[in-house]
């Protein structure tokens, strides 16, 4: 006699980028095991494969292309899947800014963490009086690299590669150049032609991009100094 099937609960959330409602389920034990093993391996390729497979498996709504979602959608989705899978509260250790040493444990309800949007954010970047550029958001691969890459901090070369991968098109009144028709080298050379003011506009795009954000109040137990801390990005909440 076969064993009974265990019912898996389903949940809904609204994607921050397009306000569409999607259905998802928690990790199964076998999926969580694969994810933990991949992260413990410190192999970025294994982590990439595991995270992709877990997110794709847990999203139940048809027609959702996970690879095409903006990075902040993926962060929000992954955080919610994790919350429904292993507990809807996470404890993180925050370094008290007044002494830079003391670790203060803080419990955060995952449903309180939202994607914050900046009113000054704009995907259209004006390069000069004639030329414009339209940006896209980092891909699923880039999201994984930012949150799980064990190689250390992002260097200048990686930063330029990230920027180049997010340029969707360059255009003026008469012509449009799609970067999908260009080589990586051509896009990188285009970037290197920019002056510092033009490049600052790109930095502003990334600096104002929607992101997971949550503000917490902490008290250093040693100095009794109170501090307000803004946590940003998935890695800040990954315990």
Across the structure, where does each feature detected by a protein language model lie?
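Long C-terminal interaction/binding lobes of large macromolecular proteins
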Residues: 1-239
